[in-house]
């Protein structure tokens, strides 16, 4: 099913007990990011993939000052807020709501959940960090209460400095997220098979085979 801004796939939202919100990267599409679900243990999940206008959630680097990426950043965060409200309205509880993003989508996912920290089902960030020319702790509130988070990144990465990944991990841990950060030397700006395996095991709790 597709509406103006979101593709909905997987189990019917009104019947599912769990939901995964999947956020594409710059230049990507909702349909692209949904294909990742085939590699993850989410067969019983409702899958929701929002589509960014112009295939980008905000125009400049995530390391630009927040003001430079306005009003697009606020609009994108609001799009996620409305999507989360829709999932909650379907009767799915926060501890069964998961977020996943790649690159710009990983940055947006991390920014959104950290501004609205709760005991979510889990968060997967394939190459991303909190948004801004620096980290603004005053923007973040709530308590993750042990939410499992996996952050994977290459080093070096052309878009996401590993130092920002480390700083993001530290802040989320201070907000009581159970963060696993894994740095892959020379991986490039992509998603590796090991990242998929780590996310499956650590966040989606798939049994080890």
Where are these regions (language model features)?
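Short alpha-helix in the alpha/beta-hydrolase fold that links the catalytic acid
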Residues: 33-36, 136-137, 161-171
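A conserved short beta-strand
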Residues: 118-131
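Short beta-strand/loop motif that positions the catalytic acidic residue
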Residues: 150-153, 157
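Short beta-strand immediately N-terminal to the catalytic nucleophile in serine-hydrolase-like folds
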Residues: 99-101, 126, 152
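C-terminal catalytic histidine-bearing segment of alpha/beta-hydrolase fold enzymes
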Residues: 26, 166-209
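Serine-hydrolase catalytic machinery in alpha/beta-hydrolase-like enzymes
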Residues: 1-96
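Active-site signature of alpha/beta-hydrolase-fold catalytic machinery across serine-
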Residues: 35, 111-115
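Gly/Ala-rich beta-loop-alpha elbow adjacent to hydrolase catalytic centers
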Residues: 100-105, 109
